[in-house]
């Protein structure tokens, strides 16, 4: 029976794709890949390429990166309808996403539209912040410590509350939001407790502990994450 698979391809290194994900990628009839900018190559596709069969049908679809949900919903509905049609025609269809499909992924919106229409299965992947923690040798949590994962697009109030309440705080995709995040870290005395990792697990990975040299005007790679550790291991 044909099925729709949401497949996490991990943080960037193709060798961090799970065995199950690699096997399913090899067996797909159609692969959908997300495209943030029209005409740009999907980064997730680059990670998955070593596992794709030669004549696989690839459908790269644009997902607008805008705040308006109404604008995004039009595209979600159109793409989910196309996926459903492919599955009903007997094709095994995949949608790949960076990291894990259930962590800040467009896939979640497609799943909500499709799970009552067709057979769906979600294949987990390694998140960027779990990869970061391993590379840094820093446990995300120990004993009774708490962990928060926040998008840098959240309000200053939400980010500050997380920084005050939790022991470890991940702030994702900070590159375009330094003017919000840096003042909060400085206010709470956490600049020296913050690890910065750009392009985790990729060839151009950059790592830094302490943000005194970073300003709101600093140009950082798009895939830059802060890990705030109140107790550095």
Residues covered by each model-derived region:
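Class I S-adenosyl-L-methionine
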Residues: 1-14, 19-21, 26-118, 207-208, ...
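Short gly/pro/ser/thr-enriched loop/turn and capping motifs at secondary-structure boundaries
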Residues: 38-41, 66, 127-130, 178-179, ...
């Amino acid at each position: 029976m044909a099925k729709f698979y949401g497949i996490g391809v991990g943080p960037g290194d193709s060798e961090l794709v799970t065995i199950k994900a690699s096997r399913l990628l090899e067996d797909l009839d159609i692969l959908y890949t997300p495209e943030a900018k029209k005409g740009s190559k999907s980064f997730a596709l680059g990670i998955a390429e070593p596992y794709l069969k030669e004549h696989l049908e690839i459908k790269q679809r644009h997902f607008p990166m805008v705040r308006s949900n109404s604008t995004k919903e039009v595209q979600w509905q159109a793409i989910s309808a196309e996926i459903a049609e492919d599955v009903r025609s007997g094709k095994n269809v995949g949608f790949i996403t960076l990291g894990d499909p259930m962590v800040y992924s467009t896939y979640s919106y497609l799943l909500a539209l499709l799970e009552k229409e067709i057979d769906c299965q979600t294949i987990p992947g390694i998140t960027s912040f779990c990869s970061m923690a391993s590379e840094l040798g820093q446990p995300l949590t120990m004993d009774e410590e708490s962990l928060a994962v926040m998008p840098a697009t959240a309000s200053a109030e939400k980010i500050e509350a997380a920084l005050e309440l939790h022991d470890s705080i991940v702030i994702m995709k900070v590159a375009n939001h330094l003017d919000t995040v840096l003042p909060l870290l400085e206010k709470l005395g956490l600049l020296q407790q913050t690890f910065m990792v750009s392009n985790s697990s990729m060839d151009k990975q950059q790592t830094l502990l302490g943000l005194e040299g970073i300003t709101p005007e600093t140009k950082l790679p798009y895939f830059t994450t802060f890990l705030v550790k109140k107790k550095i291991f």
